């Protein structure tokens, strides 16, 4: 009898973290690798947030807090939703967890029974399907390639709904594509949802503040307040405030769900870090004037990467509205031989080829559920990004047509 549960047998470690691990190993060995695989901002946590954490330490704020998050932080989150999204939540409709990932995990653990279906547009963030599977749910994938602007249409959604559908996942702006749903697209999705009262929606808004070209961000509960009780909104401080390591995420939804998720959290991690919670209060309540400049900086990096990669004969690029990723179509290169005679058969082969020949780390598209693509993160310096993209271009140029 194996000591490892059968439930875990189909679950794999995060492929994006695997890329980072391999890259770090190569760097340690002295190889000049440029990493375009990590999904975190390259700017530092703002000083006022750091000072908020330091003050918490000096004040001895190092004890347990409420399992579901301290009231002061939940009030800051409540105020944020009202101020930025015009959505009203009560404190008992909000939960704070150790990162957005735990919020989502708690949600599915608390709400899914065996056989419940979760509609996941592909490409998707790598953790969605495995968290659904760990919660005994069934992921239902809907391919949304570059021809669909990487977004789920209302028609495709309706075709995917069955009597077993319990959740739909919407991630906007998206990881791995940066694609973002506008008002009309969300309204069309809401029209479908009004026909199917058994379908709930998880709206993952973690990249809310990283949008480009005057794109106007909307979240579903803001557009369809009549569906609010069926919508669970996930957000956090990781991306907008560059606090990935501080591990504070939050979610808002029905009191029934929050109560159930709190039970899950009480038997796993208990409360999020007290010091990080105080830092998050400062993030949400403090100055917000660095958010737009950081987004503009990301936009400049997007434009730089696009200007180079669009020149590559085998690539097709989508211009994302947000986040800090490009999801590049590369299937035209499949079947071609490298200069060493190796055939590139899929996105894994292609990512391996770039790592070995260009010395650039990217993530294969299959990791996000859609073959024929690769993802780069442009959350790095302009100099490193330009160098990496030129390396990719030159490496592909030597492959015979």
From Swiss-Prot:
Its main location: cytoplasm. It is found in: Cytoplasm. GO terms for molecular function: glutamate-prephenate aminotransferase activity; L-aspartate:2-oxoglutarate aminotransferase activity; pyridoxal phosphate binding. L-aspartate binds at residues 39, 125, 175, 375. Its EC number is 2.6.1.1, 2.6.1.79. GO terms for cellular component: cytoplasm. GO terms for biological process: amino acid metabolic process; biosynthetic process. The record marks 12 as: Important for prephenate aminotransferase activity. It holds the Pfam family Aminotran_1_2. It catalyses: L-aspartate + 2-oxoglutarate = oxaloacetate + L-glutamate; L-arogenate + 2-oxoglutarate = prephenate + L-glutamate. SUPFAM superfamilies: PLP-dependent transferases. It is an enzyme of class 2 (transferase). Its cofactor is pyridoxal 5'-phosphate. InterPro entries: Aminotransferase_I/II_large, AspAT/PAT-like, NHTrfase_class1_PyrdxlP-BS, PyrdxlP-dep_Trfase, PyrdxlP-dep_Trfase_major, PyrdxlP-dep_Trfase_small. Keywords: Aminotransferase, Cytoplasm, Pyridoxal phosphate, Transferase. The modification N6-(pyridoxal phosphate)lysine is found at residue 239. Belongs to the class-I pyridoxal-phosphate-dependent aminotransferase family. Catalyzes the reversible conversion of aspartate and 2-oxoglutarate to glutamate and oxaloacetate. Can also transaminate prephenate in the presence of glutamate. Homodimer. PANTHER family: ASPARTATE AMINOTRANSFERASE (PTHR46383:SF1). This is Probable aspartate/prephenate aminotransferase.
